A protein has these predicted regions:
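N-terminal secretory signal peptides that target proteins for export/translocation
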Residues: 1-4
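Bacterial N-terminal signal peptides
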Residues: 8-19
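N-terminal pre-domain segments of enzymes
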Residues: 25-60, 91, 384-400, 404-420
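Mature N-terminal segment immediately following signal peptide/propeptide cleavage
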Residues: 31-82, 102-106, 362
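PEST-like low-complexity, intrinsically disordered acidic/proline/serine-rich tracts
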Residues: 40, 82-100, 106, 111, ...
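Repeat-blade elements of multi-bladed beta-propeller folds
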Residues: 43-47, 95-115, 138-164, 191-213, ...
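Short, polar loop/linker segments at the starts of domains and inter-domain junctions
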Residues: 53-65, 83-96, 247-250
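Extracytoplasmic/lumenal domain signature
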Residues: 64-78, 118-138, 148-151, 164-189, ...
């Protein structure tokens, strides 16, 4: 692509390619980021590399010339806009369905899911190389994965469609019958995002309902060559697992939630560790029937990518009552401290905290303190007495509010600000006892309250 480079934007139902005109591109390395792709002009994974950096080393598009980008082609990801709206609920080509995918580019070919199909395109022109129409449950809106083959089996495009894991021949777009049963594997529990490819292993998560009981949210792995199931990691600690004692009164039984739902996974290719960001146990906002810290909910768990064997865990919230699980897998990087290189990861949570851990051991690098937090007045609830606060870095988002933070005369007029404060008080006022303020109890006979702020 001498003399030009494309920026690809996927927005809703349209894929747009932008072109910048300039001189030859200068390609640079990715420094100390682990597992950089061999072809820097490709975008082979959801976040570019297995470390989840989202960083491209290409230098042709810059802050100086980005304003000169011109649209050169578009591709409609939702071809059948006249389809009935009922089909938009995850099946077929519904008029209300869309694609929220990050396209991947491997060996100069772009792959992505549309609505009800998976396509391969020429990045320079948007021309279709092949399309595969998906019947039944629609393909994941988040993206697809590429497995390079093994000399016997050809390269494959692998994606989730409901509870099915499907493999296509990357060159032809046809079902690869050597994978599973005629190109499909029944995952049993659905997964709506992008499988992780590590060597000949495919790792998938789980999307489970929000009810307290139901299907497990376990991460699972399948053989990329045959589709055979390799391992399953219990996201709710079972008898004999580390952390099983964090579920009181057998509350681990038939417990849903704590699922591995992220759009993608990150893996330390050198150490063979995949990092599972696990969600809150169900139910999200009441834990009276699950007293204890509830491992491995709200945790990052490192497991052996080949075997699924537990290596370590770090829990960001004990006994979550706020649905403040990690919104994404950790990013992997190396840092130098006291003259020593440390393999690190950074995990964010919906509480606004970032935890920087040694990705080999799970130990905090800059310290974590267990601090007392507010109690709960909800009958039957037993909020955990402490929560882990990172010493560094400081919160990356506001995690508590005071009444004066909601509106002030500087935001509007004094009269309007006073009217807003009166309206807030009329509806119960503001309850805030700092980070991890619990939900207040209101009997059915009591007036409505509260405007809760945390």
């Amino acid at each position: 692509m001498c003399g030009k480079w494309f920026a690809i934007l996927a927005t809703g139902a349209i894929l747009t390619a932008l072109l910048v005109q300039s001189g030859g591109a200068q390609q640079q390395g990715t420094g100390k980021q682990p597992a950089a792709p061999k072809q820097s002009s490709d975008w082979p994974l959801y976040r570019h590399d297995s470390a989840g950096t989202g960083y491209s080393p290409l230098t042709q598009i810059t802050t100086e010339n980005v304003a000169n980008l011109k649209q050169v082609w578009t591709y409609r990801l939702q071809p059948d806009v006249s389809a009935p709206a009922a089909a938009a609920k995850g099946k077929g080509k519904g008029g209300g369905a869309n694609s929220e995918a990050t396209p991947i580019v491997v060996n100069g070919v772009m792959y992505l899911p549309g609505v009800g199909r998976v396509v391969a395109l020429e990045p320079e022109t948007g021309k279709e190389i092949w399309t595969y129409e998906v019947t039944g449950a629609a393909p994941s809106r988040r993206g697809v994965a590429y497995w390079p083959g093994d000399g016997i089996n050809p390269p494959r495009i692998v994606f989730a469609a409901g509870r099915r894991l499907i493999a296509l021949n990357a060159n032809s777009g046809k079902i690869d019958p050597g994978f599973g049963k005629e190109g499909e594997v029944d995952m049993v529990v659905p997964y709506n995002s992008v499988p992780l490819v590590y060597r000949n292993v495919l790792v998938v998560g789980a999307n489970t309902p929000a009810g307290p009981s139901g299907a497990p949210g376990n991460a699972r792995a399948f053989d990329a060559r045959t589709g055979a199931k390799l391992w399953e990691f219990n996201s709710v600690a079972q008898p004999g697992d580390v952390g099983h004692d964090t579920w009181e009164a057998d509350s681990w039984k038939n417990r849903s939630g704590a699922n591995a739902w992220p759009f993608y996974f990150t893996v330390d290719e050198q150490r063979g560790l995949v990092y599972l960001p696990l969600a809150s146990p169900a139910s999200d906002f009441y834990g009276g029937d699950r007293k204890g810290a509830n491992l491995y909910g709200n945790s990052v768990v490192a497991v052996d990518a080949l075997t699924g064997k537990y290596r370590w865990h770090f829990q960001t919230i004990h006994h979550d009552l706020w649905d403040h699980d990690p919104p994404a897998p950790p990013a992997l990087f190396d840092i130098t401290r006291n003259g020593r290189s440390i393999p690190a990861l950074a995990l964010t949570t919906k509480s606004g905290y970032m935890y920087i851990l040694n990705r080999e051991t799970g130990e905090p690098i800059f310290g974590v303190e267990e601090r007392p937090v507010p109690k709960s007045d909800v009958p039957g609830e037993q909020a955990y007495p402490t929560q882990p606060f990172p010493v560094k870095p400081p919160p990356i988002a506001r995690n508590s509010f005071k009444p004066e933070d909601l509106v002030s005369a500087q935001d509007t007029t004094p009269e309007h600000a006073q009217a807003c404060r009166e309206l807030i008080e009329k509806n119960g006022g503001v309850t805030n006892a700092g980070p991890f303020t619990t939900w207040p109890y209101r009997p059915d006979s009591a007036p409505a309250k509260t405007t809760r702020s945390r």
